[in-house]
Structures are given as structure tokens and as C-alpha cells.
Amino acid sequence: MDFVVNKIEAISGSVKVPGDKSISHRSIILGSISKGTTYVRDILLSEDVQRTIGFFKKLGVSIEQKNKVIALKGMAIEDFRPYTQELDMGNSGTSARLLLGLISGSPHAYVLNGDPFLKKRPMKRVTKPLEQMGAHIEYLEREDLLPIKIKGGNLRGIHYKLPVASAQIKSALILAGLHCSGKTVIEEPVATRDHTEIMIQHFGGTVEKNNHFIQIKGNQRLLANEVLVPGDISSAAFLLVLSAIVPKAELMIEDVGLNPTRSGILHVLESMGARMEILEERVVNGERVGNILIRHSCLKAVTIEGDIIPTLIDEIPILAVAATQAEGITVIRDAQELKVKESNRIDTVVSQLKKMGANIEASHDGMIIQGPTKLKGATIDSEFDHRIAMAFAVAGMVAEGETKILKSECIAVSFPEFTEILKKISK
């Protein structure tokens, strides 16, 4: 499916973005292993999250869905039923990596697989420490890649230093650590998103954090709770940048998650000169939430590097679009993790923005962008990457002429209402 966009003149209105994808995944995972019934409200029912829901249904967890409310009757992991067929993770790296960690605590053997794109993404970064904890891993086709057969049980706690800053690896080991003997200690090179730690505490569990060290006691049983999922700041990022670069723009985005480990996008946009206000800030389920008001702004170039990168790794494609409209040279570095996302996002962003006339070059760990540039419409290959598709839809709305986004159905992975919201707020 293709998505065609044209230049717009104004943005206005008040909107809500879909529920946070990371929190939606984790609420299903933790609710499924908690004692009692968990209710999750305003959940993101995207393709990725549906993969996680489908996984637990196949293993015997009772999950009822009505609109955007999910009711889960949790069960002990040792009571998961055997499942001899492949468990299909689709294109969801979050599902694959976190669920490998979780089911390493089950005595049964399971096979996880994915679509052709997920099967290109590395998994040994998760399976290697799981093997150290005692899980049995078998690569059924190629080393490091799905499909993977995993058999767990009798895990032991370890001290593991993450080779890269990755919330998915960290979360997989935390979930395994809940079901092992002894204590698991995880050392991060820099802090990454901490939704898993926050939510485990919301479900009555214990996670200790001290600087870059996370400690998890083994053999914990969580207790059911209610979860209200805030709006996803990674989805809001597209609307924030669009509002900053469209000449006549003022937009309110309501009930957005403002977790400090995810809010790097806000700090960078402020550094670039974006006119933003955070209103009605509050705490829900241990997560900061608020409304964001943003207006058109004259942006200036910045350097994005170091510890802030993990807090905005998913927002770099849309920040690259913002940089094409900023005065000066924007440098993005320390972002080599972009190479193993749904696509190689460094190569994809650079090649597709060049089609639109941007002055941009790739580096080994990021990109360099000279702005401002008058973009021109082009045909964009999204590489089936949802964040690429949405970033270039935004670029197309400030470009002269028509922009066509190929394979735009991938947007449903995280933001099914994206095109509808664009139509609602655009003039």
C-alpha cells in the first residue's frame, strides 16, 4: 500500500496519540504472569502488541479484549501449556526479545519465529546471557537469527554487563531474573528506558536500581494490578516535528508519557529552539504523563550524541527530518544501534532524504545534515519500517510537490491512526 502526501500550510487542534507501545507490551507480559486479573486500559492494539497478546493466548493465558481495554487472568510461568508449533512474532523485535527472556523460565521448549524482516535482526545479544543463566538455545536455521528453539527452567542468577545500551536486552534479562534462583545483576553502559523496572514495582515486585546497575531477586511472583497506558512519545514525536516545521502551526498533544528515559526528543527539540510547553504533568502507574503544546519554530542545528542517544533512538529518523529545516549543521553520532532496527535506519534515512534534495551524509555511527533545505517531493521506499514511513510522511508535508511513501502499511505496527490524525490536524 502506498501513502501520498502533499505540502500543507497549517497545523491546528488537540489530539491524543495511541498508547505507548513499550508499556503496552510490558503490561501484557507482566499481567500474564501475575496472580489475579489485570486490567489494561488505553492499550495500543497495533500489530506488534497483538503478537504479544497472541503469544500468551496460545500458552493458555485467558485474555479478553473490549475496545482498548484488556483483561488478563495471569498464571504462574510453570503452568504455561506446551505448544509444539512455531510462535510467530511477526515483525516485533520487542515481542521476540522480551519473550525469549520470559519463557527461559519455563520448563517447556518453545520455538519463536518471525517475518523475513525480523529474521534478519540479531538475537544472540539476548540468547547469549540467557544461556549463561541456564537456558538451552538452538538456532534452527542460521546462527544468531530466528527461528530459535528455547528450553528453560532451573535458571540461576548472573552478573551481566550489557555490551550495548539496549532496553530490550535488559528487559529480557529482568524477566528471566524473576524466575531464577539467586540474584541477577545487570550493568548498563548508559541508562535505557526503564518501563520494565517501573511496571514490575507497580505489580508488587522488587527491582533495585543504583546508577547503571539493576538487581532482581529471583523466584518472585507478581500481583495483578490496573494499568492506564499513556500516549506514546515516540508516536507523538512525528506530530511534534511536523508542528515545529510547518509555518502556521499550534498543536496540543494530550496525555503523553514523559518518562525521562524516553524524553530525549523533547530536550533536543528545545535545544533546537522549538516552542513547547509541558502542561498538567502528573504521575500515573509510576510513569510521568502530561500534555505537550507546540508551535511553529525557527529551528537551529545541534549535535546529538552520547548518553542522550538511548533516550531517543527511535526518534532519530524524524529528528533528521527536523534537521533538514534547521539553520546550520546537525551532527548525529553514537547511534550505530540504528543499523539493526527494522531497517538500517542510517542508510535508509540518508538515501531517502537525498532523494528529496536534503544535504545529508552518513557516518559510521550516525549522520551529518546541513540545513535549511527546501525539500522536494519524491517516491520513498520505507523498507517496511514504520518509523521511516512516518518520518517521510512528515517530510512530504513540507516538501514541494507530491511525496509517495511505498509499503506504508507498516505504519500499523505502532501508530494505526497516523494517517487519520494527519488529515484531522492539517490545513
From Swiss-Prot:
Binding residues annotated for phosphoenolpyruvate, in chain numbering: K21, G93, R121, Q168, R345, R387
Organism domain of life: Bacteria
First-listed, main subcellular location of the protein, grouped into a coarse class: cytoplasm
Disulfide bridge partners, by residue number: none
Gene3D superfamilies: Enolpyruvate transferase domain
GO MF term set: 3-phosphoshikimate 1-carboxyvinyltransferase activity
List of residues binding 3-phosphoshikimate: K21, S22, R26, S166, Q168, D314, K341
EC number(s) recorded for this UniProt protein: 2.5.1.19
Record-level GO BP terms: amino acid biosynthetic process; aromatic amino acid family biosynthetic process; chorismate biosynthetic process
Keyword list, A-Z: Amino-acid biosynthesis, Aromatic amino acid biosynthesis, Cytoplasm, Transferase
CDD domains documented for this protein: EPSP_synthase
Signal peptide: none
Reaction catalyzed: 3-phosphoshikimate + phosphoenolpyruvate = 5-O-(1-carboxyvinyl)-3-phosphoshikimate + phosphate
Location within or outside the cell: Cytoplasm
A GO-annotated cellular component: cytoplasm
List of catalytic residues: D314 (proton acceptor)
Alphabetized Pfam families for the sequence: EPSP_synthase (PF00275)
Recorded metabolic or biological pathway in which this protein acts: Metabolic intermediate biosynthesis; chorismate biosynthesis; chorismate from D-erythrose 4-phosphate and phosphoenolpyruvate: step 6/7
The protein's assembly and partners: Monomer.
HAMAP family noted in UniProt: EPSP_synth
Protein role: Catalyzes the transfer of the enolpyruvyl moiety of phosphoenolpyruvate (PEP) to the 5-hydroxyl of shikimate-3-phosphate (S3P) to produce enolpyruvyl shikimate-3-phosphate and inorganic phosphate.
Family affiliation: Belongs to the EPSP synthase family.
Listed name of the protein: 3-phosphoshikimate 1-carboxyvinyltransferase
Native species: Alkaliphilus oremlandii (strain OhILAs) (Clostridium oremlandii (strain OhILAs))
Gene behind the chain: aroA
